């Protein structure tokens, strides 16, 4: 992901543009927050959802619920477009809270899964948002920068670039399971059983990981289709 002069960034519209070099991450984690190149800040959105004055009473109620449950981020990301279909907005918000805050995974583990999903889904906006969340949760920029982009994403690339940087066998198992499911749309028996063993022999934890992958793939498709820009 790191080049010697410039890094080529492919945006959501399919065009490419040259961005300044992202400096090689230092071992000093205090500099981590300054090393990510935001790729989708200038996107012109296709649709950001209904305007407040045009919302129905049901949409306003759902909007208020989203704002109450997401005081720091509000209607950013896919939530605006979702509001155009109230039942989808309501259900998506509830599922999002469940997979983000209602699982047995640590925040660091969850953010690792989300960032892998965003990279594989070619969603710069999702990655831009969750780089900051991942750093807060304890991931380093070295780990985040090592995650392969969509066109080079594979279980082999993850094994070479990311796995050596992870802290423990539990994280490595989660990353391997996530990468294989994203890359192959299924996982082999060996991966399933080894991941289950690393996670306390609980199938339910694999349900949680798979649900996070599914939800953030869904979110990535929304962000990509409607060209929702990033925010720093």
Residue ranges and their predicted role:
Residues 1-4:
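N-terminal export/membrane-targeting signals
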Residues 7-8, 13-232:
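Hydrophobic alpha-helical segments
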């Amino acid at each position: 992901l790191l080049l010697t002069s410039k890094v080529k960034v492919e945006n959501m519209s399919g065009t490419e543009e040259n961005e300044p070099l992202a400096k090689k991450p230092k071992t000093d984690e205090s500099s981590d927050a300054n090393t990510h190149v935001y790729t989708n800040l200038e996107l012109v959105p296709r649709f950001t959802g209904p305007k407040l004055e045009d919302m129905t009473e049901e949409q306003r109620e759902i909007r208020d619920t989203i704002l109450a449950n997401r005081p720091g981020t509000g209607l950013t990301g896919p939530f605006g477009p979702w509001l155009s279909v109230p039942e989808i907005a309501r259900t998506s918000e509830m599922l999002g809270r469940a997979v983000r805050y209602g699982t047995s995974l640590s925040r660091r583990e969850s953010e690792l899964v989300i960032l892998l999903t965003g990279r594989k889904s070619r969603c710069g906006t999702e990655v831009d948002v969750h780089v900051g969340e991942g750093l807060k949760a304890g991931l380093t920029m070295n780990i985040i920068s090592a995650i392969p982009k969509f066109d080079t994403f594979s279980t082999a690339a993850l094994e070479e670039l990311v796995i050596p940087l992870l802290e423990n066998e539990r994280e490595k198992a989660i990353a391997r399971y996530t990468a294989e499911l994203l890359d192959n749309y299924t996982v082999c028996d060996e991966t399933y059983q080894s991941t289950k063993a690393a996670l306390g022999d609980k199938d339910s934890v694999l349900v949680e990981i798979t649900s996070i992958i599914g939800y953030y793939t869904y979110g990535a498709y929304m962000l990509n289709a409607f060209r929702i820009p990033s925010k720093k």
